[in-house]
Amino acid sequence: LPHGRLNALILPHVIHFNAADGTAAEKYGRLAKLCGLAANPRSLAAGLNRLRAQLKLPERLSACGVEGKELTAALDGLAEAAQADLCAPSNPRPAAAEDLKSLLRELA
């Protein structure tokens, strides 16, 4: 799955996850306002979902050819790789392996 396509799918979910951090929520709200949306993380995520739909990008991994069984089999490795990524420590909210698996399951 291309990196950009996966980002288009997962970014709204990541915004919801990170918005539990007050500082991140505030920054997402400012970004939403700059985009002409209501100044909150939910509006930003919804706006990204609308943009994804306008670009005719898929909403689910299954629409990209990733089957549920395939995803389930890969979850542990994907979560481990995400936690090992050099960018992971800079995420506004620490993500445990189960958090990452949950985000991916939301995309199934």
Named regions from a protein language model:
Residues 72-108:
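Short, amphipathic C-terminal "tail helix"
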Residues 1-73:
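Gly/Pro-rich interdomain helix-loop hinge
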